[in-house]
Amino acid sequence: MSKNIQAIRGMNDILPEQTPLWRYFEKSVAGLLDGYGYRQIRMPIVEFTELFKRSIGEVTDIVEKEMYTFEDRNGDSLTLRPEGTASCVRAVLEHGISGGGQVQKLWYVGPMFRHERPQKGRYRQFHQIGVEVFNLPGPDIDAELIVLTWRLWGLLGLREAVTLELNSLGSSEARARYREALVEYLSARFERLDEDSQRRLSSNPLRILDSKNPETQALLVDAPKLADYLDEDSRQHFEGLKARLDVAGIPYVINPKLVRGLDYYGKTVFEWVTDKLGAQGTVCAGGRYDGLVEQLGGKPTPAVGFAMGVERLVLLLETLERVPAELSRQVDVYFCAFGEAAELAALGLAERLRDALPGLRLAVNAGAGSFKSQLKKADKSGALYALVLGEDELAGRIVGLKSLRAEGEQQSVGWDELGERLAACLRA
């Protein structure tokens, strides 16, 4: 017997009992973004590898270790997208939709791919909802993105579980001055750095600030501080952001070691973190990337955005038991029919109900079965009500209306009154 083929490690099936929560989360985010005037964009999941090398940075863990890269039949190097920002910028440039200073407020949702060690809430195929804004340079739009996420946490009941961390990376010139000071400080202590940090010292020294190695973190306590090297424009931008968050009543923590894992960030960077999921605590992160559009061949264009991890936020909702009870219900109403004539009538009645009550979740029993077995299936579906149609009901042009979640006698309802009566029951 041949061995069953299984899913690739770190790439998981999302089963029917899980998808209602995913849909609830995605619908909550989409509705909120629509309300703020953001428009959806959809990009391909495969891009030329060069896009990510130029945007993310060649000397990053993502490009060096984690990308799924392959050569196609034409000899082109292609990569499954590891994140969405670079693809979105490529699309905006390719189609010219940010030219002439046009403001674009965009969002997307879909799978991303990174070959890293699978762990709780972290997978090799994972899903993100991303938001990107082009041609707005001020701290007001940075604040809007954070206010928007704060509102989302409120809608989902997660505000008490997340903390906002902020930092400013300053201008590229300010970072260059700081980089020199940091390299000088760490070079004198090179032997005490962990292996990854030693490698990064010559290629991407700011990423050392993000090291998880305890000895390296101890060395950084007395290292030069990025805040001391900020240019005046970045300083004012950061103060403007903090002032707006204060007015909005959003608490935050300044984290001077927050640098983000991608090379294109500058000025504002932020993360929403939680301590409810163990070590992998970031659920949403972003910042400003004013130089990326030009870096990818466009004109200088201010830009800012964020991405949130769907798996981690779904896991957080489950961990904190913030899952709405109705999500366990497959349908609102289950139609039981006994006998061929009743089955035919039930089909017609069900379609009339769907016409009369848009949005009604109604399942008609398939596969026949006894009264007891059909009611058992109705109960298992989570339906609030069962409709019962047998020979007697058919003869009298009535339907039995039975509550599955409350005590009470089955009611007989005429076919013409069924839609109105059912609507009243579901509103109650």
Swiss-Prot record:
<keyword id="KW-0030">Aminoacyl-tRNA synthetase</keyword>
<keyword id="KW-0963">Cytoplasm</keyword>
<dbReference type="Pfam" id="PF03129">
    <property type="entry name" value="HGTP_anticodon"/>
</dbReference>
<dbReference type="InterPro" id="IPR004154">
    <property type="entry name" value="Anticodon-bd"/>
</dbReference>
<dbReference type="GO" id="GO:0006427">
    <property type="term" value="P:histidyl-tRNA aminoacylation"/>
</dbReference>
<keyword id="KW-0436">Ligase</keyword>
<dbReference type="InterPro" id="IPR036621">
    <property type="entry name" value="Anticodon-bd_dom_sf"/>
</dbReference>
<dbReference type="InterPro" id="IPR041715">
    <property type="entry name" value="HisRS-like_core"/>
</dbReference>
<dbReference type="Pfam" id="PF13393">
    <property type="entry name" value="tRNA-synt_His"/>
</dbReference>
<protein>
    <recommendedName>
        <fullName>Histidine--tRNA ligase</fullName>
        <ecNumber>6.1.1.21</ecNumber>
    </recommendedName>
</protein>
<dbReference type="GO" id="GO:0005737">
    <property type="term" value="C:cytoplasm"/>
</dbReference>
<dbReference type="GO" id="GO:0004821">
    <property type="term" value="F:histidine-tRNA ligase activity"/>
</dbReference>
<dbReference type="GO" id="GO:0005524">
    <property type="term" value="F:ATP binding"/>
</dbReference>
<comment type="subunit">
    <text>Homodimer.</text>
</comment>
<keyword id="KW-0648">Protein biosynthesis</keyword>
<keyword id="KW-0067">ATP-binding</keyword>
<dbReference type="InterPro" id="IPR045864">
    <property type="entry name" value="aa-tRNA-synth_II/BPL/LPL"/>
</dbReference>
<dbReference type="InterPro" id="IPR006195">
    <property type="entry name" value="aa-tRNA-synth_II"/>
</dbReference>
<dbReference type="InterPro" id="IPR015807">
    <property type="entry name" value="His-tRNA-ligase"/>
</dbReference>
<comment type="similarity">
    <text>Belongs to the class-II aminoacyl-tRNA synthetase family.</text>
</comment>
<dbReference type="InterPro" id="IPR004516">
    <property type="entry name" value="HisRS/HisZ"/>
</dbReference>
<keyword id="KW-0547">Nucleotide-binding</keyword>
